[in-house]
Amino acid sequence: MSDYLGAHMSIAGGLHKSVERAVAAGCGTLQIFTRSSNQWKGKPVSDKDADLFRSSFAASGLHEVISHDIYLINLAAPAGDTRDKSLAAFGDEMATCARLGINKIVMHPGSHTTDSPEAGLERVISAFDQLFEQTPEYEGLVLLETTAGQGTNLGRTFEELQTIINGSKYPDRFGICFDTCHTFAAGYNTATPEGYADVMAQFDRLLGLERLLCFHFNDSKKGLGSRVDRHEHIGQGTLGLEPFRFIMHDPRFITVPKILETPKGDDDAMDQVNLALLRSL
């Protein structure tokens, strides 16, 4: 597919199967978990599996494949077991992506849990400085994802993401993944032309539009500023179709991957429905 619309696909049956699923759904881009998203230790990727994934992707016609880190990782956690496991797991993810030829990893900045956002952000900064130094084989980027700000989750504001990037010794290693559901739930109104223009101007001023390297395309079950992360099919939630229309027609984002994370339905059938709707805008 010539455009950059895509979806998150399962790796059930092997990493290369995600590529087959993306092509079958009519995707131009792809996002995957490289292992089970709810286990700290993943099955090591064999050389055979890595080669098969690389060759499948090269032959697929897909523009790009992006990894998403596992849900358990919390690099904002205070010192202790969760932080230690998170550092190890993200380091493993970086090493795996290097072997698979994936050069972008989307991640949630994490939760500060019991103290302050400022303390949590400092821990994220420290974690990435350590990870970049300890995993030189991964030469790609980490894409910090905008979040809805549930509970003590970090990344609700562009300013928090800016703090991580500016605080790191390696600011050039970061990009941003803009989740349409999360930003709306966080209070950024992209549902009107004026609101969309204002949000993108804020993003450009604080982070730089050149860092916006991926979209997660999700409608929201909850309202503007709700700080609740609940994805909905495109056009069936509180965002409506306009934010997606604005992005699809924005010349600045033509070659930026736009990844669906909406409910799948039977046999991933809803991916094709959502992709067709987006292409009709």
From Swiss-Prot:
- Entry EC number(s): 3.1.21.2
Positions contributing to Zn(2+) 2 binding: 145, 179, 216, 261
- MF annotations from Gene Ontology: deoxyribonuclease IV (phage-T4-induced) activity; DNA binding; DNA-(apurinic or apyrimidinic site) endonuclease activity; phosphoric diester hydrolase activity; zinc ion binding
Q: Which UniProt keywords apply?
A: DNA damage, DNA repair, Endonuclease, Hydrolase, Metal-binding, Nuclease, Zinc
**What cofactor does this protein call for?**
Zn(2+)
Q: Kindly list the positions annotated as binding Zn(2+) 3.
A: 182, 229, 231
Task: Give the matching SMART domains.
Answer: AP2Ec
The superkingdom of the source organism is Bacteria
Q: Which reaction does it catalyse?
A: Endonucleolytic cleavage to 5'-phosphooligonucleotide end-products
Q: Where does Zn(2+) 1 bind?
A: 68, 108, 145
Q: What does this protein do?
A: Endonuclease IV plays a role in DNA repair. It cleaves phosphodiester bonds at apurinic or apyrimidinic (AP) sites, generating a 3'-hydroxyl group and a 5'-terminal sugar phosphate.
Q: Which family does it belong to?
A: Belongs to the AP endonuclease 2 family.
Q: What is this protein called?
A: Probable endonuclease 4
- The organism's taxonomic lineage, starting at the top: Bacteria, Pseudomonadati, Thermodesulfobacteriota, Desulfuromonadia, Geobacterales
Query: What gene is behind this protein?
Result: nfo
